[in-house]
Amino acid sequence: MQNWDTATNNNSNNNKSPALTMQQTAANSNNFLEHNTWYNQMFAANIKQEPGTINPHHQHPQQHSSMMASQPQHSPLTHSANHLENYLKQHAHNGGGAHHLQFSDNSGAMTPSPNTNVGGQDFGFESNTSSALNPSLQQHQLYQQHFQQAQQAAAQNQVSSHLPLGFNPLTPPGLPNAVLPAMNHYYSQQQQQQQQRQLQQTPSPSACLSDAHEKSSALTPRHTPPMDITPPKSPKTTVQAMDHQQHPEDQDLISNSSEDLKYIAESEDDESIRMPIYNSHGKMKNHKCKSCGMVAITKMAFWEHARTHMKPEKILQCPKCPFVTELKHHLEYHIRKHKNLKPFQCDKCSYSCVNKSMLNSHRKSHSSVYQYRCADCDYATKYCHSFKLHLRKYEHKPGMVLDEEGIPNPSVVIDVYGTRRGPKNKSAANAALKKACSDLKIPPTSQLSAALQGFPLQQQQQPQQPASPAKSSSSVASELPALTLNMSLQQNLAQQQQQQQQSPGAQSHSSQQQINNLLPPLASLLQQNRNMAFFPYWNLNLQMLAAQQQAAVLAQLSPRMREQLQQQQQNKQANENGEEDEEDNDEVDEDEEEFDGKSVDSAMDLSQGTPTKEEQQTPELAMNLKLSEEHGETPLFSSSAAARRKGRVLKLDQEKTAGHLQIASAPTSPQHHLHHNNEMPPTTSSPIHPSQVNGVAAGAADHSSADESMETGHHHHHHNPTTANTSASSTASSSGNSSNSSSTSTSSNSNSSSAGNSPNTTMYECKYCDIFFKDAVLYTIHMGYHSCDDVFKCNMCGEKCDGPVGLFVHMARNAHS
């Protein structure tokens, strides 16, 4: 507009006089003020004023307000057209025809007004302005409405394309402290803001900024939880949140535990099975195939790959999603997740799950006991899977496993490289042996049961079922009183009859036997047969229990009984020294003296440890063999230690070996009667039932003719030089940290006449462990544990063992598949 005024003034000054120039200048100044008033009215809020211009609002505020009140509002085009028409009219009256021609030439380049007749001579500006006032006002209002609608649409597109989350990403909706405003409140505020913007005449760009700020502030949670709260791994989507609002009864069934969010009901359209899953630490969850090791990042890819390892006829597929499995209970657990059924509820919190194993794992979170500890470092954990991962990663060894109450449980074995979940029990290692041993024939009476009862059994009594050596010490001890009470009357009657028939020399031994009967049966059994081998890890508990029982009984004995015991030992020692004409009798008497000294003077001294090789080679238990006139048999055992036969399959009498071996390290033998010459009177002995442990006769055999049997039992050893030498099974006893094998091997000369009376049986001997087996299955199972390169290395798992005892302990404690 200033350029137009300048051009007009230059043209007028060239053709007019000074008087006309002054009038024109005054008119231009009035027009300039009017133009600035209109210009500021239209664009004062949006366009910055130039430094040289004068704002009419500051110079004439009252005049401007009165003028705005009196005059109606016009559109920008109408105001500009009226202003130019008035300006040209003034120049037409003052300038004449020449000036009009020049103005027409200059105005040809300008934009004509729609109400101006450029080619005509008559300019009716006032009439045209008054007639076009109402249409121009309507056009201005219509333009303003269209402009506001377009601006609102742009603001909505901007907000929808950059919609804020509405919650803190670390504390998404669903947490108890997150409070979001209601959606209806948000929409009501938005409608009020739109109505207020419609009342504004001129739109402003600041309205969009304030609108976006108000929307973002309305969606921000008012009470944000603290940042130290661990967020869930997968927040709920908006659609799921709306579904939970519509069905509050279904929402109550869902547990608020973060672990349950992994099992949100999946469907074919759920993105959780097609997209990778990230945990709270930002780490992506991988799905590893147990068959080939393939790693998938989505459930969909993992299930597709799992199909390749399954047989088509065994595939079980979920009807709601692509989940596949071969196990029926896995499909059942998966369907429970779809139905949101969690029948297993924790009794200490609100946690619920779909199966029992998940509940057991959760219950450990409430316990303060760390069951699994590493033996090589300070690592401790509550979960077996984490413990196995630690052992595999650092190649460490597991320590003692605790039970749920924090008590050490040595029967639990950690299979580090196994695929089976959870720990294993040691009893599983002996399942094959127990099954094979169940097929063996059990003798009519058991040596172990007879010894545990603490009194001799007559042939007329009912056969007793053998006590299993795999029982614990507490269960065996609980059976002892019942066995003793049931047969106490028969024992007393048998002792009275025997005392009437006994010789004066045998009555002294009867008193010794009565003293031994005072001891607990288990203590008496282990005291008289120290090398009797139960299972290696079970024998120590029995010895400790027997020592406690024996100490308690000896503490209650009177001084007279103790003196009687010492006197009997001295008498035996004198008799043994007087009988040096035979070497075999000397060895038996020396062994008896050594054994009685240990058993009487010390209450089951466990500090002596495992017997040495010299002690193992001596026939400690040959003193307990009994003689009988009714059976013409030779003893199975003798004192010769050089008659061992390793690696040979021996043929022995079935009667002599029946019940002699039960399991690999638990030898028991039937009663082997010796047929002696007529040197022994037939009236000094009574029939004896063949049920005695190898060498256990002091507490479980007949009291008659015991001393005479010792003196005359070996006179016939050399009368048959053509008999075959046989070897018996060795016995092994281990305690705690002992790794040396305790084995004895004895041989005897069998009578040819008695060997032909009964069928022969085959004996299998392990030359590495000095153990005999009657059954080929047991022998095969046992030899399968010996490795070819190293006989004491386990052939199943490759673990190196220290001797035969270490190998037996390893076989008993570790489960082998």
Swiss-Prot record:
<keyword id="KW-0238">DNA-binding</keyword>
<feature type="region of interest" description="Disordered">
    <location>
        <begin position="187"/>
        <end position="252"/>
    </location>
</feature>
<dbReference type="GO" id="GO:0005634">
    <property type="term" value="C:nucleus"/>
</dbReference>
<keyword id="KW-0677">Repeat</keyword>
<feature type="region of interest" description="Disordered">
    <location>
        <begin position="456"/>
        <end position="477"/>
    </location>
</feature>
<dbReference type="InterPro" id="IPR036236">
    <property type="entry name" value="Znf_C2H2_sf"/>
</dbReference>
<feature type="zinc finger region" description="C2H2-type 6">
    <location>
        <begin position="792"/>
        <end position="816"/>
    </location>
</feature>
<keyword id="KW-0862">Zinc</keyword>
<comment type="function">
    <text>Gap class segmentation protein that controls development of head structures.</text>
</comment>
<feature type="region of interest" description="Disordered">
    <location>
        <begin position="491"/>
        <end position="513"/>
    </location>
</feature>
<keyword id="KW-0863">Zinc-finger</keyword>
<keyword id="KW-0479">Metal-binding</keyword>
<feature type="compositionally biased region" description="Low complexity">
    <location>
        <begin position="721"/>
        <end position="758"/>
    </location>
</feature>
<feature type="region of interest" description="Disordered">
    <location>
        <begin position="51"/>
        <end position="77"/>
    </location>
</feature>
<feature type="region of interest" description="Disordered">
    <location>
        <begin position="93"/>
        <end position="132"/>
    </location>
</feature>
<dbReference type="GO" id="GO:0035282">
    <property type="term" value="P:segmentation"/>
</dbReference>
<feature type="zinc finger region" description="C2H2-type 4">
    <location>
        <begin position="372"/>
        <end position="396"/>
    </location>
</feature>
<dbReference type="InterPro" id="IPR052145">
    <property type="entry name" value="Mediator/Homeobox_domain"/>
</dbReference>
<feature type="zinc finger region" description="C2H2-type 2">
    <location>
        <begin position="316"/>
        <end position="338"/>
    </location>
</feature>
<feature type="zinc finger region" description="C2H2-type 3">
    <location>
        <begin position="344"/>
        <end position="366"/>
    </location>
</feature>
<feature type="compositionally biased region" description="Acidic residues">
    <location>
        <begin position="577"/>
        <end position="595"/>
    </location>
</feature>
<feature type="compositionally biased region" description="Low complexity">
    <location>
        <begin position="62"/>
        <end position="76"/>
    </location>
</feature>
<protein>
    <recommendedName>
        <fullName>Protein hunchback</fullName>
    </recommendedName>
</protein>
<feature type="zinc finger region" description="C2H2-type 5">
    <location>
        <begin position="764"/>
        <end position="786"/>
    </location>
</feature>
<dbReference type="Pfam" id="PF00096">
    <property type="entry name" value="zf-C2H2"/>
</dbReference>
<dbReference type="GO" id="GO:0008270">
    <property type="term" value="F:zinc ion binding"/>
</dbReference>
<feature type="compositionally biased region" description="Low complexity">
    <location>
        <begin position="189"/>
        <end position="201"/>
    </location>
</feature>
<keyword id="KW-0302">Gap protein</keyword>
<feature type="zinc finger region" description="C2H2-type 1">
    <location>
        <begin position="287"/>
        <end position="309"/>
    </location>
</feature>
<feature type="compositionally biased region" description="Polar residues">
    <location>
        <begin position="680"/>
        <end position="694"/>
    </location>
</feature>
<keyword id="KW-0217">Developmental protein</keyword>
<feature type="compositionally biased region" description="Low complexity">
    <location>
        <begin position="564"/>
        <end position="576"/>
    </location>
</feature>
<dbReference type="InterPro" id="IPR013087">
    <property type="entry name" value="Znf_C2H2_type"/>
</dbReference>
<feature type="compositionally biased region" description="Polar residues">
    <location>
        <begin position="103"/>
        <end position="119"/>
    </location>
</feature>
<dbReference type="GO" id="GO:0003677">
    <property type="term" value="F:DNA binding"/>
</dbReference>
<comment type="similarity">
    <text>Belongs to the hunchback C2H2-type zinc-finger protein family.</text>
</comment>
<feature type="region of interest" description="Disordered">
    <location>
        <begin position="564"/>
        <end position="619"/>
    </location>
</feature>
<feature type="region of interest" description="Disordered">
    <location>
        <begin position="666"/>
        <end position="758"/>
    </location>
</feature>
<keyword id="KW-0539">Nucleus</keyword>
